[in-house]
Regions:
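Catalytic active-site module of serine/aspartate enzymes centered on a nucleophile-bearing elbow/loop
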Residues: 371-402
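Alpha/beta-hydrolase fold nucleophile elbow
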Residues: 237-250
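N-terminal cap/lid segment of alpha/beta-hydrolase-fold proteins
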Residues: 66-68, 72-75, 117-166
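Short alpha-helix in the alpha/beta-hydrolase fold that links the catalytic acid
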Residues: 325, 339-348
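Short beta-strand/loop motif that positions the catalytic acidic residue
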Residues: 323-324, 329-331, 335
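Alpha/beta-hydrolase active-site loop
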Residues: 216-238, 258, 378
Length: 402
């Protein structure tokens, strides 16, 4: 699929490239989203210096990919040296860090160029080597889909092995538009594994490696993927098919909602940092131009006018009404990518047990505000809520303002 999406041009990306570079020079690499925080979190404290160095190195858009790639190569070199010396834990850690950095270096590549494919291969190699040394079972997951396969990684809690028929509860963890499956399970102290919950970190249609593999975003594709993924998970002897939930972050909140609407076997759905505006006008026309360009790549469009028509299909309306399982929505009061009113309207439309939790002053990426520190931590809240659903604990349909 080399060059399959080459030639993406958007008016604002072209006209405002100089502005993006100047904003990055003034504000830094996290101008549009707290990416270095999001990527640092699953790595833990040893990687802090990596991200601090990247923040210093990046002064313009073109610096982003090389900055992450350089750190990835250094970490991969350290991992191989540790492996040769028999230092398994050090090798494990460094392969994980390298995979995260390689994945991050792919983000600016909005086409399946030879460079993007090379970075993707390096990412997979490092994460596969991490999986060999991990402190829990990790295996590559390929879910058959339309003659191809959706890419993921299956994680079992420590102490469990494939085929042991332990009937674990499990979640399908869906990343956001700019997120990737490798960062959805922490190197240590993961919130799901620590609760005895297995995790399928899998990229659905259009997301990261699925886009590389030529599987584009569309509402019908996500509806079909919901059943494909559930069939795969339900067939695993280690997992309890009655206790499989779906959770999505950022644009994964929209995808997760579609999944719950079209596959009733998922027993619960929890979403956070919402992208629930029908048509996605705010994120594509008022936020950083990079969001629109990225999603055009994800959906396989090169013509902006055709993509604008396609965006009209990106809605939960006519789908969310079908959800019958418990639904949690965690949102920021000041979400700049998807105004809170759209999450409010979705919750009013749902015909299932539901709960909305709004964090005061929080922007799209819920957290980094006093309410997220003084109240329940957003990601912890989601994990505890889903765990409670696995064990059938009742809850009152409520709207919390934290």
């Amino acid at each position: 699929m080399t060059q399959a999406h080459a030639g993406i041009v958007t008016r604002r990306c072209t006209e405002q490239r100089w502005l993006i570079d100047n904003i990055i020079r003034s504000v830094g690499i996290d101008w549009d989203q707290p990416r270095t925080v999001s990527y640092n979190t699953p790595c833990g404290p040893e990687a802090n210096a990596d991200f601090a160095g990247i923040r210093e190195r990046v002064k313009k858009y073109a610096d982003i990919s090389p900055a992450f790639e350089n750190v990835a190569r250094r970490r991969a070199t350290k991992a191989r040296a540790a492996e040769d010396a028999g230092e398994v834990v050090t090798a494990r850690n460094n392969y994980f860090y390298a995979a995260i950095h390689y994945a991050a270096s792919q983000w600016p590549h909005d086409e399946n160029s030879s460079k993007n494919l090379t970075l993707n291969a390096a990412k997979r190699d490092c994460y596969s080597r991490y999986a060999q040394h991990a402190d829990h079972h990790v295996e590559a997951a390929w879910v058959p889909f339309q003659g191809k396969a959706l890419p993921g990684w299956l994680h079992l809690p420590p102490g469990h092995q494939p085929g042991d028929r332990s009937k674990l509860p499990a979640v399908w963890s869906i990343p956001g538009m700019d997120g990737f499956k490798e960062a959805n399970v922490a190197l240590y102290g993961d919130r799901w594994l620590a609760r005895g919950i297995a995790v399928l970190a899998l990229e659905g249609p259009g997301q990261y490696e699925s886009a590389v593999n030529g599987i584009p975003v569309s509402v019908p594709n996500w509806a079909e993927a919901a059943t494909a993924v559930m069939d795969w998970m339900a067939a695993r002897p280690e997992l309890d098919p009655r206790r499989i939930a779906v959770t999505g972050n950022s644009f994964g909140s929209f995808f997760g909602t579609l999944v719950a609407a079209h596959e009733p076997r998922f027993c619960a759905c929890a979403v956070a940092s919402t992208c629930l505006e029908p048509g996605c006008h705010t994120i594509f026309e008022e936020a950083s131009p990079t969001f629109k360009r990225r999603f055009m790549y994800m959906s396989g469009y090169t013509d902006e006018h055709a993509f604008d028509d396609f965006c009209k299909t990106l809605t939960w309306e006519g789908h969310a009404e079908k959800i019958r399982v418990p639904y949690l929505c965690v949102a920021g009061e000041a979400d700049e990518l998807s105004p809170l009113e759209h999450a409010e309207r979705l919750l009013q439309t749902l015909q299932c047990p539901r709960q909305l939790v709004v964090y005061q002053d929080s922007r799209h990426s819920v957290g980094n505000v006093p309410s997220a520190n003084l109240g329940p931590h957003p990601q912890t809240l989601v994990a505890d809520w889903i765990q409670a659903r696995f064990y059938g604990k009742p809850f009152a349909p409520e709207r919390w303002f934290v």
